[in-house]
């Protein structure tokens, strides 16, 4: 779920800070983050960090939460967000491209509601040419990443299901094109609908990522257990993909995940991530019993303890 920076601040407090060292190979980076009601400041090696940069440039994180199940169950927006998040962790040029596309779509939709203004058609055409340039790049990157995820997630799921189930991810692009010019032509062909409904009806903001088991949509026909296995294997595929592309291992965060999993899925997850630095949050230590080596810290009222207080 989405949270604001201010939500991290303890009740009855007006600010919070995070101070730590990131080690990557032989290199160390000192990171200090200070968040208050009014501002957020980040320092890396005592130098103020550009807020427009993604902190994931410093190191990769993959988060597992119980809410991940909604990626399967909910609408296509969450599936697009997952793919965009994965691409961003691999390609830091992607975020500004997507941000510019979203801004252009917002402005175009605003223009579509004012069709009587002078030079309307010249303006809408200029928007379409700009949108096509960014949309085609997003389309290419999504298509490439989904193919890799499909391959890796299939392998994990096939193994977990003892060969009984075949997991698939398919990119159902709303507009398919072989060039930005072809993308523009398809937007042009759809313009009549856009004028009628006063909103942009076609584009990468309408893309769908279909997730299937044995060629059936898991959203509609999968059991709760199958859906849970599928999203775990997709996230494992994300971890593997990041390692393959960057050569670096992600830090794994489990946010109260094991309370939702049976022993088989928990063991499978831990087996595949045993060589990764992993941080687990839980409301009790029972879910940590199957972990061979771990350091446990207890948190109560915002304070951290080595032993149960």
Predicted region positions:
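Structural recognition of the conserved hydrophobic beta-strand(s) that form the central parallel beta-sheet
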Residues: 20, 277-284
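Nucleotide-state sensing region of NTPase/ATPase domains
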Residues: 1-78, 87-90, 94, 150, ...
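Conserved beta-strand scaffold positions in the cores of enzyme catalytic domains, especially
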Residues: 61-63, 278, 296-298
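Short, surface-exposed charged micro-motifs
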Residues: 30-32, 210, 296
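A conserved P-loop NTPase coupling/switch region
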Residues: 54-61, 65-133
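A structural micro-motif
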Residues: 16, 59, 165-167, 276, ...
């Amino acid at each position: 779920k989405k949270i604001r920076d201010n939500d991290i601040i303890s009740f009855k407090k007006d600010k919070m800070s995070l101070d730590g060292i990131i080690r990557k190979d032989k290199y160390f980076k000192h990171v200090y983050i200070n968040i208050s009601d009014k501002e957020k400041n980040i320092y890396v090696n005592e130098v103020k960090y550009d807020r427009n940069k993604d902190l994931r440039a410093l190191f990769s994180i993959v988060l597992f939460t119980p809410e991940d199940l909604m990626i399967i169950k909910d609408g296509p927006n969450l599936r697009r967000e997952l793919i965009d998040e994965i691409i961003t962790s691999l390609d830091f040029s992607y975020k500004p491209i997507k941000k510019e596309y979203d801004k252009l779509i917002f402005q175009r939709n605003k223009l579509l509601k004012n069709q009587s203004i002078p030079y309307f058609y010249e303006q809408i055409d200029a928007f379409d040419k700009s949108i096509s340039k960014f949309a085609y790049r997003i389309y290419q990157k999504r298509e490439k990443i989904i193919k890799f995820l499909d391959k890796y997630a299939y392998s994990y799921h096939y193994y977990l299901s003892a060969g009984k189930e075949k997991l698939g991810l398919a990119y159902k692009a709303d507009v398919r094109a072989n060039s930005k010019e072809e993308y523009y032509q398809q937007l042009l062909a759809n313009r009549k609908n856009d004028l009628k409904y006063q909103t942009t009806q076609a584009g990468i903001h309408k893309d769908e990522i279909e997730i299937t088991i044995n060629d059936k949509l898991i959203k509609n026909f999968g059991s709760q257990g199958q859906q849970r296995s599928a999203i775990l294997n997709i996230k494992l595929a994300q971890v593997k993909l990041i390692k393959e592309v960057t050569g670096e291992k992600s830090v794994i965060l489990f946010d109260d995940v094991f309370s939702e999993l049976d022993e088989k899925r928990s063991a499978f997850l831990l087996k595949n991530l045993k060589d990764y630095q992993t941080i687990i949050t839980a409301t009790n230590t029972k879910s940590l019993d199957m972990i061979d080596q771990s350091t446990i810290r207890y948190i109560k009222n915002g304070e951290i303890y080595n032993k149960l207080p």
